A protein has these predicted regions:
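N-terminal Rossmann-like NAD(P) cofactor-binding subdomain of oxidoreductases
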Residues: 2-190
Length: 190
């Protein structure tokens, strides 16, 4: 089953953000709040729940009155098209079944929970995952591989892989030589 990247065919994409009060969640919220084809219907977090979005995030235009809920409350929202998980490393993979995602929902995980094969995941993150859940996820950069998406569970590449892939994509079309990328990072990795 091939799914088309949602924004291409939907006029009003209904979105949820789990982990909306962390760095990744906040940045995603800022981007989606201004997107003409997106309506944010749910903001989840582990703390700062029951607060209005405007009390934590300045500059919002369309999502100011949303109440931040507990991440697990997503179970009660049946009309969400896409759920973005911006939760800390390991939280989604350890608690996947508790969220009870709907069959019609697409889930895009922005953590590293489903990026690495099991042996490397345990080595680097010390987290054991459910193999059946891991198999549902496809590690793919949708912006460059829309037609190759074969699942509703997307494991989005991290900042390094994304910045490199997006930067060299145009060059890759015209060059036949090997491209070497030399990237550096500070302590945070962000």
């Amino acid at each position: 089953i091939s799914i088309t990247w949602y924004c291409e065919f939907m006029d009003n994409l209904k979105v949820a953000i789990l982990g909306s009060t962390g760095y990744t969640g906040i940045e995603l919220l800022k981007i989606l709040d201004n997107h003409p084809k997106v309506t944010i219907k749910f903001l989840g977090a582990n703390k700062n729940t029951k607060l209005k979005a405007q009390s934590l995030f300045s500059g919002l235009k369309n999502s100011i009155n949303l109440i931040i809920r507990n991440n697990y409350d997503i179970r009660n929202y049946k009309d969400i098209d896409v759920v973005f998980s911006c939760m800390p490393q390991g939280e989604l993979s350890k608690n996947f079944s508790k969220f009870k995602f709907q069959k019609n929902q697409c889930l895009i995980d922005l953590s590293a929970d489903f990026r690495l094969p099991e042996n490397l995941n345990q080595k680097w993150y010390g987290i054991k995952r459910n193999k059946d859940i891991y198999k549902k996820f496809q590690y793919i950069l949708p912006e460059l591989n829309t037609k190759k998406i074969r699942t509703k569970f997307v494991s989005n590449p991290g900042c390094y892989a994304t910045s490199i892939a997006l930067a060299i994509a145009p060059l890759n079309k015209v060059l036949s030589t090997e491209i070497i990328i030399d990237s550096k990072s500070g302590i945070s990795g962000a």
